[in-house]
């Protein structure tokens, strides 16, 4: 079928070896393995949880008529697990996984609908230190794969929330969000010009495309906003950057305050990892402080997932040998 492929021979061996090396990075950071089912009840990935639109899920029924779904994303499954098996835990829980995910999305022409992801989740920790640990670990995964020319681009969901907090019309908020999600800044400028919103907020949206670059962007953004929520988001990014300097990873990161994610469960910092040779982000992650609560446990968390198939494509196109050195 369209969107799936066989992996065999040398490529299969390389994929297994790459998976093993990246897995070792996660273990070295003190993360423990977790496995969740390939399919779950539909409710685990419902719109209420904030994952993938229902039309993009592979759905089927069991004998009792329950709707089941091939997982499009591992994080909600882990959230369900944590609420069930770690309900009394108060200290940080470090979990890592590898597994296939499935997206039935027609816009993914020429893209795989079944991909292999490797990732990690740090649960029960709402600190900037947790955000930094996850990003530093993501950098180490890239370095261990053999990549050196890459960038982790970091944003903050609350920056956008602060800007739109005073806008009462949900339709306007959704339209602004859609323009920014698609990086359609010309469309955004045209749309904002005709909106009846405060002039200072309008000016930020008109200059949204500029809010992408190195750490100096944070100073520029702070001068542009005057609401507490956006300013707090910028302060959080600064703190994360300072901690990443202690890890020695700051040269691999940049900032994009125009970054949003289609997964609505993200609540704070979000980030994506880019390199040459692949059209999409190889790595995606962020903070989701309310997701596990949907399953019955209040547990602020942060995590990421690497799309192994995309990473292998990038390594091949950059002619990086799969047997790369460790960090």
Walk through the language-model features, giving the residues of each.
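Acidic, His- and aromatic-enriched active-site or binding-groove loops in soluble protein domains
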Residues: 56-62, 168-190, 197, 249, ...
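Short, conserved phosphate-binding/catalytic loop or strand-edge motifs used
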Residues: 113-118, 154-162
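Short, surface-exposed recognition loops or helix-turn segments adjacent to catalytic cores
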Residues: 149-160, 254-258
């Amino acid at each position: 079928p369209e969107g799936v492929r066989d992996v065999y021979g040398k490529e299969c061996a390389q994929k297994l070896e790459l998976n093993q090396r990246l897995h070792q990075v996660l273990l070295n950071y003190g993360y423990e393995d977790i496995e969740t089912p390939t399919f779950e009840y539909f409710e685990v990935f419902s719109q209420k949880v904030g994952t993938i639109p229902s039309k993009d899920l592979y759905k089927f029924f069991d004998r009792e008529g329950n709707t089941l779904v091939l997982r499009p994303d591992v994080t909600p499954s882990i959230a369900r697990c944590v609420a069930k098996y770690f309900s009394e835990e108060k200290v940080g829980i470090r979990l890592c996984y590898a597994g296939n995910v499935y997206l039935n999305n027609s816009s993914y022409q020429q893209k795989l609908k079944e991909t292999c992801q490797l990732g990690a989740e740090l649960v029960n920790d709402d600190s900037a230190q947790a955000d930094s640990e996850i990003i530093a670990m993501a950098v180490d995964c890239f370095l261990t794969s053999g990549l050196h020319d890459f960038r982790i681009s970091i944003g903050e969901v609350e920056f956008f929330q602060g800007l739109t907090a005073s806008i009462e019309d949900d339709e306007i908020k959704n339209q602004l969000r859609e323009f920014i999600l698609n990086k359609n800044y010309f469309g955004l400028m045209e749309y904002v010009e005709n909106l009846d919103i405060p002039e200072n907020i309008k000016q930020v949206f008109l200059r949204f495309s500029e809010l992408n670059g190195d750490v100096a962007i944070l100073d520029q953004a702070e001068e542009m906003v005057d609401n507490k929520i956006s300013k707090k988001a910028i302060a959080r990014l600064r703190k994360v950057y300072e901690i990443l300097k202690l890890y020695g990873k700051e040269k691999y990161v940049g900032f994009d305050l125009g970054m949003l994610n289609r997964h609505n469960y993200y609540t704070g910092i979000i980030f994506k990892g880019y390199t040459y040779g692949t059209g999409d982000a190889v790595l995606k992650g962020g903070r989701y402080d309310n997701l596990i609560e949907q399953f019955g446990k209040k547990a602020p968390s942060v995590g990421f997932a690497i799309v192994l198939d995309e990473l292998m494509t990038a390594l091949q196109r950059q002619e990086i040998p799969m047997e790369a050195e460790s960090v």
